[in-house]
């Protein structure tokens, strides 16, 4: 662990310190990272990287990531490498959490298993639903979000790069330590402080990305329907429709242009914590996560990714998003911008840590995460 800290420190300060210092070469740093778990060779192994972070919600903190690439079968010559990553964090605000992400490919890429999950204890704010609720910065309620989320999906190949998926969504939310000195926004929702949502997902996907965690070429088109009902354990009955399209263009051996369009739409008795968000560490970076939420959200962004020397890289992006309480109003309401720049460090082949700075309307924030934003 100490070797990881030392290697990362030397990398970040190398070009800004006095030339009179005798700094280690890139080859020496590669060797140190290899011994710390960041080997750039062709063998399969785990990679460990700790580091600081800052987000608008969590404040400053420290986290760590463990990522690995593996092949479930050595006889499979078609599937791309499978990846499994864990990350954890603690912050100065008292927040703590663990995230899990797995992309597994089997049987000559005819079967896939994707899993995202998280457990967290995070002091945050609830602003209410809609654009104007998010704009009123003083009209909010502080609480501690105690949350557990699991999203497994099994995909079966239909033809070529087209897959049908069957999944499940579990979301457990409890609003602890809520501030009762101001507006009781959470207590006045129909569901109250504790919400349990459980639903079955049906997914149709066209996916020919060359490497799912960090594509250079290809596209992803995804249509997803999730139905939450009491029969599946959910407190309320509602539907969630998600549309996603992203494209990746390799402009040169050092440049990639990536862009995406997203739509999240809901109907039924949607709990306050399950309303689609406009702003997180993947989309609409620069906004406090959870400040803007409504029943229907649309967003898009374009990002230019440039590889510098050795393991370094930079990105820049532009994005915009909107939301509305009804489907026919979506696109005719207020639009919010997102713009930013970021630094990339390739601690394992095709797997990056990213430090992004996003600017939104009247807000901004830093993000230290593993993997690309999309």
List the model feature ranges, each with a label.
Residues 21-23, 34-44, 72-81, 107-112, ...:
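Short loop/turn motifs that connect adjacent beta-strands in outer-membrane beta-barrel proteins
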Residues 38-47, 54-192, 294, 352, ...:
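Gram-negative/organellar outer-membrane beta-barrel architecture
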Residues 48-50, 84-88, 113-117, 164-166, ...:
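Membrane-embedded beta-strand positions of outer-membrane beta-barrel proteins
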Residues 52-63, 88-98, 108, 194-195, ...:
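Solvent-exposed loop/turn segments connecting transmembrane beta-strands
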Residues 85-87, 135-140, 184-191, 227-233, ...:
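Extracellular loop and loop/strand-boundary signature of outer-membrane beta-barrel proteins
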Residues 94-98, 119-121, 144-150, 170-174, ...:
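Transmembrane beta-barrel architecture of outer-membrane proteins
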Residues 201-204, 341-347, 363-374:
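Outer-membrane beta-barrel "beta-signal"
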């Amino acid at each position: 662990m100490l070797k990881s800290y030392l290697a990362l420190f030397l990398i970040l300060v190398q070009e800004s310190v006095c030339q009179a210092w005798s700094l280690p070469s890139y080859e020496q740093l590669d060797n140190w990272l290899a011994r710390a778990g960041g080997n750039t060779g062709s063998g399969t192994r785990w990679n460990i990287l700790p580091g600081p972070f800052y987000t608008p919600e969590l404040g400053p903190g420290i986290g760590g990531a463990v990522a690995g690439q593996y092949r479930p079968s050595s006889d499979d010559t078609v599937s791309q490498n499978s990846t499994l990553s864990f990350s954890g964090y603690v912050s100065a605000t008292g927040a703590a959490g663990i995230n899990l992400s797995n992309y597994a490919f089997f049987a000559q890429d005819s079967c896939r298993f994707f899993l995202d999950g998280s457990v967290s204890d995070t002091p945050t704010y609830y602003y209410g639903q809609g654009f104007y609720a998010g704009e009123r910065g003083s009209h909010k309620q502080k609480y501690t979000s105690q949350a557990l989320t699991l999203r497994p999906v099994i995909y079966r190949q239909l033809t070529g790069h087209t897959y049908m998926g069957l999944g499940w969504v579990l979301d457990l939310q409890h609003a602890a330590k809520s501030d009762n000195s101001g507006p009781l926004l959470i207590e006045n929702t129909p569901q109250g402080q504790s919400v349990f949502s459980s639903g079955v997902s049906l997914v149709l996907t066209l996916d020919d990305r060359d490497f799912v965690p960090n594509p250079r070429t290809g596209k992803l088109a995804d249509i997803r329907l999730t139905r939450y009902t009491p029969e599946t354990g959910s407190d309320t009955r509602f539907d969630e429709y998600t549309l996603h399209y992203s494209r990746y263009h390799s402009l040169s051996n050092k440049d990639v242009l990536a862009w995406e369009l997203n739509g999240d739409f809901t109907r039924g008795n949607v709990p306050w914590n399950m309303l689609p968000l406009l702003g997180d560490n993947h989309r609409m970076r620069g906004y406090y996560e959870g400040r803007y939420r409504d029943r229907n959200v649309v967003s898009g962004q374009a990002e230019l990714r440039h590889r510098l020397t050795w393991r370094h890289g930079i990105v820049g992006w532009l994005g915009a998003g909107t939301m509305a309480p009804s489907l026919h109003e979506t696109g005719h309401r207020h639009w919010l911008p997102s713009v930013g720049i970021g630094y990339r460090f390739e601690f394992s082949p095709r797997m990056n840590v990213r430090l992004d700075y996003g600017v939104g309307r009247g807000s901004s924030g830093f993000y230290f995460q593993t993997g690309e934003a999309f």
